[in-house]
C-alpha cells in the first residue's frame, strides 16, 4: 500500500518511534539530471532541490528526528562551471536570508560545517548571522556541509593535533578517538545513524568519511528534487528492518 503525502504530516503508524534514527544525513544528488529531464536549466534543479530540503527538514522535525545533515556543496564542486557555482553561492545566501526568521520561530538550530573561510565574504556573513540567531534553539539540529570534503576534514584535524603536540599542549599518548573528533568540522555533532543518497549512485563522494564508520546507508534511484515524505518513509522503513551490530556478531 502506498502512503500518500497528505497522510505523512505525523509519524506513520508503521514506524516505531524508538527505532527512528536520531541523526539522518543526506547526499542530495540528481538536481542537474532532474532539470535535464524536465527540459530546464540546471539551476532550476538546484532551486527545486532547496524546496525538497526544506520539506525534509520539517518532516524530520514533525516525526521526531533530532538531527539532519545535508551535503550542500563539496570541495570538488568548485570544478563545476563558474556560472553554476556563482548561482549556488547566491542561492545559499538568499535562502538563508529568507528562511532565517522561520528557522528561529520553528526552533531550528543551524550549523555549517566545512572550510567556510574559502566562501564568499557575503555568504560567510549570512552564515555567521544564521548560526548566531539560532544557537540557543533546542529543536532539530540542522547541519549544512558547505565547501566540505571528508579527506580534507581529516587532514586539517591531523594538522591541528600535530601543532598542539609540537607546542607541548598535547601528548601523543593522549590522542584517542575523542580527541580526534574534537578537531573535526563536525565536533559536537553525533555521528549519523542513517545516510540517504539519492539518484542511485553508490558512493560516499568524500562525505563524512570518519563519521559514517558504522552508519547505515540507503540508496534510492529517486532524484533529489523528487525526494519527498513518501520516499523518506521508505528509507526509514528499510532502516528499521536492519540490525545494527557496530562490528559485533
From Swiss-Prot:
Transferase among keywords: yes
Biological-process GO terms, alphabetical: polyprenol biosynthetic process
Coiled coil spans: none
Active site residues of this protein: 29, 77 (proton acceptor)
Free-text comment on the cofactor: Binds 2 magnesium ions per subunit.
Domain of life, source organism: Bacteria
InterPro entries in UniProt: UPP_synth-like, UPP_synth-like_CS, UPP_synth-like_sf
UniProt GO MF annotations: ditrans,polycis-polyprenyl diphosphate synthase [(2E,6E)-farnesyl diphosphate specific] activity; magnesium ion binding
A family per Pfam: Prenyltransf
Binding residues for Mg(2+): 29, 216
Transmembrane annotation, as ranges: none
UniProt KW keywords: Magnesium, Metal-binding, Transferase
Annotated positions binding substrate: 30-34, 42, 46, 74-76, 78, 80, 197, 203-205
EC class (word): transferase
Cofactor(s) the record lists: Mg(2+)
Record text on subunit structure and interactions: Homodimer.
Similarity field: Belongs to the UPP synthase family.
Record HAMAP family: ISPT
Summary of the function given for this chain in its UniProt record: Catalyzes the condensation of isopentenyl diphosphate (IPP) with allylic pyrophosphates generating different type of terpenoids.
Name of this protein: Isoprenyl transferase
Lineage of producing organism: Bacteria, Bacillati, Cyanobacteriota, Cyanophyceae, Nostocales
